[in-house]
Every structure is written in C-alpha cells, then in structure tokens.
C-alpha cells in the first residue's frame, strides 16, 4: 500500500526522510540529488552518508529543493510503500 504525505517545510521533509532512511538501513543524514524537473514531477535520488559521487549530478541541500518546489508553485508529497498490507 502506498502512503503519501504532503511536505510543508524542510523540518517535516527531514523527519520523513529519516524515517525512510532508517527503515532501509541507512545511517542518519544523507544527500538529495535533484535529477529532473518536469510538469507535476520533480525527480531526485536520495543517498546515505558518504555517497559515491561520479561528478555528473548536482547536489542540492534539502532546503534548496524545498525552495525550488515552492518557487515553481508545486506541492511536495513524499510517497513510500507501506509494508503493512
């Protein structure tokens, strides 16, 4: 089952991502790589601490991603699979 949570600010995003990171075995912290902005979709890749950086992606801090999303007039939803069926 998919769970969607509307993200209002950076603090809430960090909290939700930490829950997600911990459930996948990552340590606290991490980076977000903004990959693409398209209509209704902003794609980004989340990496744990010390990600391999091949120099081809630009790293954005979470607050920068939030600012970009709000500037473009989007709402941000974090969608994740819920293991409970």
Model-derived regions: residue spans:
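A short, Lys/Arg-rich alpha-helix, primarily the initiator
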Residues: 1-26
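Residues at secondary-structure transition points
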Residues: 8, 12, 55-59, 63
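Conserved hydrophobic/aromatic packing and binding residues within compact polymer-binding modules
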Residues: 17, 31-32, 42-45
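The alpha-helix within a helix-turn-helix
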Residues: 21, 32, 69
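Short alpha-helical "recognition helix" segments of helix-turn-helix
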Residues: 27-35
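Recognition helix of helix-turn-helix/homeodomain-like DNA-binding domains
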Residues: 36-60
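DNA major-groove recognition helix of helix-turn-helix/homeodomain DNA-binding modules
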Residues: 59-77
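Helix-turn-helix/homeodomain-like alpha-helical modules used for DNA recognition
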Residues: 82-85
